[in-house]
Design a protein with these regions (language model features):
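C-terminal output helix
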Residues: 106-115
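Active-site beta3 strand of CheY-like receiver
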Residues: 44-50
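Short hydrophobic/Thr-rich beta-strand motif most characteristic of the beta2 strand and flanking loop
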Residues: 25-32, 40
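Charged docking surfaces used in two-component/phosphorelay signaling
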Residues: 15-23
Length: 120
């Protein structure tokens, strides 16, 4: 299956997302923040990034934009995973280059459906 990098500052959320993705036979690499995220992405070469929006320091919207503006990482699809579920946040995520948006709390099937849509 695919290698997926999950970025979330909440250890509990990382565990939930990892469990869902590993249960679907994906390889999962976790990262707790957006500091040095580009280096992590370049080193890991994931097929997909699941990125939380609400994080200290650089938020997920900013990190998404930075990854999509970097020639080394711009082609890696990103799913924003956040508690912000209103339409303006979804629109803003798309403007930053996100390929999909999953709202917390979510069911495992919702995340896996987004992964399948994005990866094909």
């Amino acid at each position: 299956m695919s290698k997926i990098l999950v970025v979330d500052d909440s250890y509990a959320e990382l565990q939930v997302i990892e469990g869902v993705l590993k249960g679907a036979n994906h390889t999962v690499v976790s990262f707790p923040n957006t500091e040095k995220l580009e280096d992590k992405v370049i080193g890991e070469k994931p097929d997909l990034i699941v990125l939380d929006v609400v994080m200290p320091g650089r938020n997920g919207f900013q990190a998404c934009r930075d990854l999509k503006n970097d020639d080394r990482t711009k082609n890696i699809p990103i799913i924003l995973c956040t508690s912000k579920g209103n339409e303006s946040d979804k629109f803003w995520g798309q403007q930053q280059g996100a390929n999909a948006h999953v709202v917390k709390p979510f069911k495992g099937e919702e995340l896996l459906a987004a992964v399948k849509r994005v990866l094909g």
